[in-house]
């Protein structure tokens, strides 16, 4: 009765990345930078390219070559210089950092990161306002680099500092990661303060396939601070969750959102979330950006002749 989906699949480029990208590129424009760019698993590529186009700045995207075609097409449509790196996200991230330093480019999630993360705080601001300034009991956040979870915590803390919220310390943060790229979950379950990188991520949730999460240690601190948990889910559980959300709420999410929903189900089954708790589940991207992941489990449409009798027989 108290489950809420924070649906960021309806933003300008159909993911939450419009929030941090918009802030970072606005600051790049303010600083007088001549070009911007990003290292990306897909969604940030689209968002950075779109906001750069609006700002009139050249954009350079560095991304693994195996991300979803829809995300590549989006970034290219906005006019980005798209560099498909034959390697992992961490390889693309390393190269983007080096290029940014050597050529004076504002890489939004690297040398513009302090401004970039501020944009994601609005995920806390909006949820608080939409819940009539009540703090939810549980927040489930899909985690790649970990920057979003950390920013959400910061956003709630700032609202408490200006007396718009109370009892923020009572909320529980849950980090959701896909099996095959869950270094933060692994560290949490081992009660370790160090995140050991995953060298070769292997998951259908490509937007979360960040083997060496830049904010991983901060996420572990936030989980400790907010009595949280970290949990993972496999590809089948992700696909099942995508279909569940689509069929019950009419929201078609990409696999990252499926990770949130799948982990929610697990936490309820494990008794870590009570059915009476108020729960916010973050859905961070649109399913149309990653249709390859879901097509294999969908029933193929049956092609029929344009005959009213035959078609009427299959419409119950």
Q: What is each stretch, according to the model?
A:
Residues 1-316:
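PLP-dependent amino-acid enzyme catalytic core
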């Amino acid at each position: 009765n108290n489950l809420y989906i924070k649906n960021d699949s309806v933003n300008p480029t159909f993911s939450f990345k419009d929030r941090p990208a918009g802030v970072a590129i606005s600051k790049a424009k303010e600083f007088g930078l001549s070009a911007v760019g990003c290292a990306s698993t897909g969604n940030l590529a689209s968002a950075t390219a779109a906001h750069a186009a609006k700002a009139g700045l050249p954009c350079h995207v560095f991304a693994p070559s195996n991300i979803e075609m829809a995300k590549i097409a989006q970034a290219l449509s906005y006019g980005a210089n798209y560099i498909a790196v034959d390697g992992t996200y961490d390889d693309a991230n390393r190269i983007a950092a080096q290029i940014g330093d050597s050529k004076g480019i504002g890489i939004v999630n690297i040398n513009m990161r302090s401004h970039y993360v501020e944009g994601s705080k609005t995920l806390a601001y909006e949820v608080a306002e939409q819940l009539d300034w009540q703090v939810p009991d549980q927040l489930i956040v899909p985690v790649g680099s970990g920057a979003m979870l950390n920013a959400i915590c910061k956003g709630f803390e700032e609202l408490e500092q200006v007396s718009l919220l109370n009892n923020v310390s009572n909320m529980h943060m849950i980090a959701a990661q896909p099996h095959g790229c869950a270094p933060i979950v692994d560290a949490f379950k081992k009660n370790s303060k160090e995140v050991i990188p995953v060298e070769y991520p292997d998951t259908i949730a490509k937007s979360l396939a960040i083997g060496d999460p830049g904010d991983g240690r901060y996420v572990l601190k936030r989980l400790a601070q907010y009595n949280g948990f970290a949990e993972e889910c496999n590809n089948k559980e992700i696909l099942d969750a995508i279909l569940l959300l689509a069929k019950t709420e009419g929201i078609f999410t990409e696999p990252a959102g499926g990770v949130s929903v799948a982990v929610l189900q697990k936490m309820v089954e494990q008794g870590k979330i009570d059915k009476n708790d108020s729960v916010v589940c973050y859905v961070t991207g649109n399913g149309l950006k990653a249709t390859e992941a879901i097509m294999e489990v969908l029933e193929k449409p049956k092609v029929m002749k344009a005959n009213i009798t035959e078609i009427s027989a299959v419409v119950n």
